[in-house]
Amino acid sequence: MCKGGNKVNKIKVRFAPSPTGPLHIGGARSALFNYLFASRYNGEMVLRIEDTDLERSRREYESEIIDSLKWLGLGWSEGIDTGGPNEPYRQTERLAIYQEYTKKLLEAGQAYYCFCSEKELEVERQDLLDSGQMQKYSGKCRQLSMAEREEKLKQGIKPAIRFKVPAHQLHIVDDLVRGRVSFDSDDIGDFIIVKSDGIPTYNFAVVIDDVLMGISHVIRAEEHLSNTPRQLMIYDALNFRRPEFAHISLILGSDRQKMSKRHGATSLVQYREMGYLPEALFNFLALMGWSPEGEEEILSPAEITAAFSLERVAKSPAVFDINKLNFINQQYLKKIGDEELKEMLKPYLADSKYLKKIEQMGEERYELLVSTIRDYLVCLADVKEQLEVFFGDIDYAGDAREVLAGEGVIPLLQAFKEGIHKVNKVEEIKQLIKGITKTLKLKPRDVFMPLRCALSGQAHGPDLSSYIAVIGGEEAIRRIDRAIDFIKSQ
């Protein structure tokens, strides 16, 4: 369970999103892995909000993130919405706490005031770039005397505070996913821990929060690996015990580039709106980087939780395979009863142009519609596309045109028209078609195909008798008449 030298009495993890936008798929997976790890080992999870990016952070995104996590089926023992022993859980409400630890570092000579302007720093960066040197701060404000610092403060210059990086230190992390990773402090310049506006930087605040909240394991995306050496230095400078680290791989698009908007929907709320089920996304996200011991891939949240371990989390990048998500979602949809599915589809029908038709067809025919289309649904929003099959404009083109041009189609359609006004149940319609097949001495295919093409304009589709029962006899007759007129006009 816990490789490395740190022994912990209780597992405690955290998910700490920045409320700068909706919950991204990558963030949702990180939250899920934290939740699974805590649940698997009877631990606790904290939901913390890292909102030190004042320009982009929004309270509405906080609410959306919390709602998305709960919809996915995740829970936490303490956090921004539930409270707990380590309040507050929003970083901008913890500034006094960070100031206390900033003071300790300053007094110990492990941090210092930096008066460099952004313009000066940009010139310094450009000079390093032009000379091919490593991009890191020169440390010139490290050398300022007390008198020089006092003078700059008197001038009203608001300083940032930098951490004084110790020279010639090797920082080693036995990462629970990536194995041993080492960092040389000489590759890292003195870094800012508090900006000139008094707001702490991520690398500083996250360490203080994790320690004070008792976080034992930091499970996060691989892109945070480069932040780790800076955080380790702060842990050591303040004599804090380091947590265990586990950096999970990036999520790539189908082209094996980092997932972005060009690959399609990227936020959890978008998939929710499209009608993907939370259990399916839970299942799918768990399999992006983690694999169970067996071959089975359709696993319930309880089964995934019972089997989860960081030892089975891969180092290699996870690829977001929309076809796999679609397959998993279809499997979960198939498990849902018709009655429940009817209710789940209602929000997706509310703005449909065919809503009036559905309301007029009655409960029995609506139930038949749902049971007929359910196997064609990849996600709930697909119901709109399926309604086009039943109620959309018919275009006799392609295969349909060719089938309707066949010999003996008009007598077949007329025979169907004469019989359909007498029946309306699925079984009755099946018997009608069977009788026509026998009377006209045709093969079943030579009856089904022309009827389907005449009624829907398509050569393939849902069960024909169910389709006819859904649209109703009156509409079926109208379509048959139109098909006959079309054939005669050719």
Curated annotation (Swiss-Prot):
ATP binds at K261. A motif ('HIGH' region) lies at residues 17-27. Signal peptide: none annotated. It is an enzyme of class 6 (ligase). InterPro entries: aa-tRNA-synth_I_cd-bd, aa-tRNA-synth_I_codon-bd_sub2, aa-tRNA-synth_I_CS, aa_tRNA-synth_I_cd-bd_sf, Glu-tRNA-ligase_bac/mito, Glu/Gln-tRNA-synth, Glu/Gln-tRNA-synth_Ib_cat-dom, GluQ/Sye. One of its GO terms (biological process) is glutamyl-tRNA aminoacylation. A motif ('KMSKS' region) lies at residues 258-262. The keyword Transferase does not apply. NCBIfam families: gltX_bact. This is Glutamate--tRNA ligase 2. It comes from Syntrophomonas wolfei subsp. wolfei (strain DSM 2245B / Goettingen). The lineage of its organism: Bacteria, Bacillati, Bacillota, Clostridia, Eubacteriales. The gene is gltX2.
